[in-house]
Amino acid sequence: MADRVSELFTQNISEKNVSSAYAALKTLAQIIETSSQTTARGLFDELNEARSQILRKAFQISKISSRRLLSVRAGTDMFLYHINKVLSKADNFETCRGEVQLRAFDLAEGQQRSVDRIANEAKQLFKHGMTVLVHGYSRTVTSALELAAKSYHIKVIATECRPFCEGYETCKRLQKMRVPSEAILDGAVASYMGQVDAVVLGAEAIVESGGVINRVGTYTIALIAKQFQKPVYVLAECLKFVRMYPLSLSDMPDENFADFQALPGGEEFQNTRMPLCDLTPPDLITLLFTDLGILTPSAISDHLIQLYNG
């Protein structure tokens, strides 16, 4: 089973414009579709094992690419909760199998719906002549910028976002849509913040406190934005809401750290270890634009309760 799950996940994650989290959900939906289990408990145990295999594969991928692991963990956690909810309410497993499959694929194929909803919600952020700073590469953020650019003349400044330099991917996509954009060094954020009207960020995960886990450097950018009195907006699907309450970087899981080789010229520091993501506290976030609506950071805890107990 392990090889099959790994193969399905690898295939799904390689599809264009499919995030890691939704690739994981599609993999779980495919497991449900082909499962030979005859009991609800058997199916749920099979899904739990498949999730473990997906997380192991996602961890391997995250070490060599910008693919995210925490979003996979959050998304599959929510997916299994809702599938288990359907299974536990059924009197007969065979009669609910079809409903479980429909629910699974509905969750797995919801990425574009969620992204479109957020882009439409976020459109009100923008105005003519606005300059926006972004960090990393987020399909949700770039989709919102592309939609806004159809109505407003905006400019985008993208940080390089090392170590994977995702900022260049952001600029490449935006330039294809004729959205003016330029990449800057991560260390140059303070130099450019004065000409920025707002910071718009994606997220790998949104924790119970309303804090945001995102590419390393996000916390620094939010601190600089506060110093310059610039708003910080986060665009992310509720699939990324996660039942975690980290208080600092030291509370982040070990999988958040990776080893890299320094660039030529840094031989004395050839082996480097760094976090892939950091935690931005809720007091530095102005608003979150989600597929559940526009939320304040303080509202996240209540929405997590609704998502898991509603």
Region annotations inferred by a language model:
Residues 3-4, 143, 148-154, 159-310:
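Conserved phosphate- and dinucleotide-binding cores of soluble alpha/beta proteins
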Residues 7-8, 23-31, 53, 60, ...:
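Alpha-helical scaffold segments in soluble metabolic enzymes
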Residues 1-100:
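Long amphipathic alpha-helical segments
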Residues 69, 112-115, 218:
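Generic alpha-helix initiation/capping and coil-helix boundary signal
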Residues 15-18, 33-35, 131-133, 137, ...:
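Short, glycine-rich nucleotide/cofactor-binding loops
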Residues 80-133, 150-199:
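Ligand-binding beta-strand-loop-alpha-helix segment within the catalytic cores
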Residues 68, 131-142, 163:
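Gly/Ser/Thr-rich loops at beta-strand to alpha-helix junctions
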